[in-house]
């Protein structure tokens, strides 16, 4: 997930300083966050060799078509974020973001690497959280077979193995890392991962964490009038994510005027 503004640039600066020569995008590119045009312009500058479809791209694609359930606070939150994205991003560009595979494979010598946002055939859900069932993780390395699986979605850096000894890793989230443990949650630096290969195989795995100016990002969110600002604040400052807390979202939408803005947009037809 790389939906933020300031943090994306800091993480990229770190990767460039190290000498990363290709980039993989594991989905959830634009929402929620301030990035929008800045993110797409940034990605255009990178040697991206792999990208897969995240669940937020699905939500964005359906949201701009006003196909989400506007009676649910969590869906209204998504719709308002989609409306915000449309201020800078065209429908054609959203179509490109959505027109990505769920899973791809890369070959490094004898090693096959599977890349997905979540499961090979499903980019949403909780099957691959840190306490997920082993048989669910095995799907990453058996459908089809691969030696290493890289996935996103859970916003947690993770390393574990398939039943057959295959390596399974998650680079975490550049935008909004997630921790259940309160002490770990005090460190909300941007997360990503570097994999280094040579002609013999996998040389190194480096789980990275990068500082960024949280205050600057929050000020940018205010300046750009990011909807549901308090949700964003809680994610960046406290590591608490409210995107599924229905009553919290309902009250915040009324407080910030998001309901009025969204209803006006929903009534405006397909513009």
What are these regions (language model features)?
Residues 163-271:
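Acidic, His/Gly-rich catalytic cores of divalent-metal-dependent hydrolytic chemistry
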Residues 10-13, 38-41, 65-68, 129-130, ...:
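Short, glycine/charged-enriched secondary-structure capping and boundary segments
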Residues 18, 87-160, 166:
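His/acidic metal-ligating clusters that form di-metal
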Residues 23-28, 32, 50-55, 116, ...:
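Active-site neighborhood of phospho(di)ester-bond hydrolases with catalytic His/Asp-centered motifs
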Residues 2-6, 31-34, 56-61, 150-162, ...:
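Active-site environment of divalent metal-dependent phosphoester hydrolases
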Residues 60-62, 123-124, 216:
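A short acidic, helix-capping loop that chelates divalent metal ions and anchors anionic groups
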Residues 1-46:
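N-terminal active-site segment of His-dependent metallophosphoesterases
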Residues 42, 46-104, 128-140:
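Active-site neighborhood of divalent metal-dependent phosphoester bond hydrolases
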């Amino acid at each position: 997930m790389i939906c933020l503004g300031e943090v994306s640039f800091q993480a990229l600066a770190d990767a460039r300083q190290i000498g990363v020569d290709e980039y993989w995008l594991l989905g959830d590119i634009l929402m929620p966050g301030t990035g929008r045009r800045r993110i797409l312009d940034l990605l255009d500058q990178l040697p991206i060799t792999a990208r897969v479809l995240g669940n937020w791209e699905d939500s964005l694609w359906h949201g701009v078509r006003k196909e989400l359930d506007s009676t649910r606070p969590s869906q209204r939150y998504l719709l308002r974020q989609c409306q915000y994205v449309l201020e800078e991003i065209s429908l054609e560009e959203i179509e490109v973001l959505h027109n990505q595979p769920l899973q791809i494979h890369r070959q490094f010598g004898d090693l096959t690497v599977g890349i997905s946002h979540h499961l090979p055939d499903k980019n949403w859900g909780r099957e691959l959280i840190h306490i997920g069932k082993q048989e669910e993780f095995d799907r990453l390395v058996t459908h089809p077979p691969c030696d290493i699986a890289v996935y996103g979605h859970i916003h947690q850096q993770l390393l574990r193995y398939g039943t057959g000894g295959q390596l399974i890793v998650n680079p975490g989230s550049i935008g909004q890392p997630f921790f259940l443990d309160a002490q770990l949650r005090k460190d909300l630096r941007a997360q990503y991962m570097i994999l280094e290969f040579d002609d013999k195989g996998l040389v190194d795995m480096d789980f990275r964490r990068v500082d960024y100016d949280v205050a600057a990002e929050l000020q940018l969110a205010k300046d750009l009038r990011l909807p549901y600002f308090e949700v964003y604040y809680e994610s960046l400052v406290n590591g608490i994510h409210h995107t599924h807390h229905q009553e919290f979202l309902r009250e915040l939408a009324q407080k910030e005027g998001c309901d009025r803005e969204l209803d006006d947009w929903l009534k405006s037809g397909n513009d």
